[in-house]
Amino acid sequence: WKPFVGAMKAEVTDNNGQKYSVETILGANELYDVAKFKITAKTNAALFAPSVVANSAAWIVMPSQAGAPIKANIDKVEKFMTKYNYCVLSTTASEKYNGAPVLNDKGQIVGIYNSNGTLQSATDAKYANDFVLTGLSQNDPTLLQSGIRIALPQQPDEAIIALMLSATKIESLRMATINDFLQKFPTLNNGYVTLATKLLANGEVAEADKTLQQAIAKTTAKDEAHYNYGRLIFQGVTTAAIADKAKAQGWTLDKAMNEANEAYKLNPAPVYKHLQAQIVYTKGNYQQAYTDFEALTNTPIKNPELYLEMAQCQEKLNASNEAVLAMLNQCVELCDTPYMETSSPYFLARAQQFNKMGKYR
């Protein structure tokens, strides 16, 4: 593992001198100094030794260009984590052989070589082979010591978590993770909407539109795909910095509503009705928007945002200050405690209303 620490890229050289780039990290352990990674090639895996016994011979093998194999003796075999072998060796192999495979007389892998100057050992390669990534592996302190991309888990639910956590990565790693997700899980909406959101933030409206239409064509949850399309159209139309590009792409509030309606027709989820209500408000039909927001307070998505939106409708409808304040009080009452940063817009809106009413205390 040590060679990967601080590295932005790495190469593996096989016995024929062929070099392969390391594509992703699949796991690592600092204590045993082992790592699991994927290279940009398909190769035939060596066989693991079915058993290892003390007082047997082994060979520490490097690519032939780097030198001949060095013989070692397995002095002692210890178990760790109940099923893996840790072999103490006697050998003349130096630290430059660290990470090399240790093979038995049959060419089967006994372990991964490590020398710290005073102790020579081989850690069971099956231990590294059994590493399994989870979504939270994106924030694993050990794996973050390397600049090489952490791979996505195999399970879709875990991969979705990994995709979300990759938002903090540098641009190249973030984009590689998104593209990897799209390749591995082409029928899930998460990859498409993540990419489209990123494209939209960069002002690439046409590419975002193309990505969202691909989602509608390829994903299994069509309602979610239509909702994401409508939501990002709405975002594009109402964001001043990209409004002109959105208009040029044919994005309008009516188009956003059509997508929201299609999503709701496929699956009458409250979140889709919420998008419809937001579009109605933006189009200036404040009474209908208020009615729609109010209806949503009787659904599972009852939250502070709905009451803030109802307060905004009340203001547009010239309701009394007290009526607006009542809605904003509901906002604050629904905020989770202890209060988090996400609650600040609701406290700010209420404070502004108090100021408007002359209630400065």
Where are these regions (language model features)?
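Catalytic-histidine neighborhood of serine endopeptidases
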Residues: 1-30, 127
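Flexible, gly/ser-rich surface segments that form the specificity/activation loops bordering the active-site cleft
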Residues: 44-87, 92-98, 113-123
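C-terminal cap/linker of serine protease catalytic domains
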Residues: 112-179
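Short coil turns that delineate tetratricopeptide repeat
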Residues: 186-187, 220-221, 265-268, 301-302, ...
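Start-of-helix register in tetratricopeptide repeats
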Residues: 190, 224-228, 269-272, 305, ...
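Residue-level recognition of tetratricopeptide repeat
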Residues: 197, 231, 238, 278, ...
